[in-house]
């Protein structure tokens, strides 16, 4: 039960949590298009425990065409029978700025259920944005603040043609679970990651995680992104008290640029 709750849920969130450089300015060059879909498997050692899906779709929000970003993470097999996890996150974002307009969190974890929405107003204030939560009401947040899912795609857009320096640190500003959340992440260099498709050139990043109940060290989480203009998450790894958990890309479709790999 502990494994499924921690590893599957954190795999779902890590793709989003550790991938937003909120203080940077968005570029116009795109990194993704509607129709993109990324599929991941979550493993504890050699045991398959979960699945994660990331997708981009078209939608209409307040009469305007927007991106509908979608993330679902769930347990499978034995883990699902022990402790069911089926979490869905959605974000509706402005196509030009990649700023979130509305976010949805729909959580099903065994007997626990949670559904909440947030809407964002980035334009009525010059120095900040406003988030209206269905649970906590109105909150003033950092200008252009991202939700947990939109941060992934915002980062991907601003990382097009960008080459970070070794150990360069970034501060992330998001609003998640009705709390302002700041995260420090570091670029650690370039590595080749073996996948089902072949070896892929990647950029490695590490967030500074909180130690204690789950992590022994602040460097116990790593994520690898494709070193190209797609900048898609290829692999995530967690070193936690009960072992090592990985989340690996197993299928993709609808990428804006070809994904390069060597067999």
Regions found by a protein language model. Give the residues of each.
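Hydrophobic, well-structured mid-protein blocks that either form specific transmembrane helices
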Residues: 116-159
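Single-residue recognition of alpha-helix boundary sites
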Residues: 20-21, 56
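Sec/Tat signal peptide C-region and signal peptidase I cleavage site
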Residues: 22-26
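Bacterial N-terminal signal peptides that target proteins for export
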Residues: 1-12
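Bacterial N-terminal signal peptides
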Residues: 11-20
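Acidic, serine/threonine-rich low-complexity disordered tracts
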Residues: 27-122, 161-263
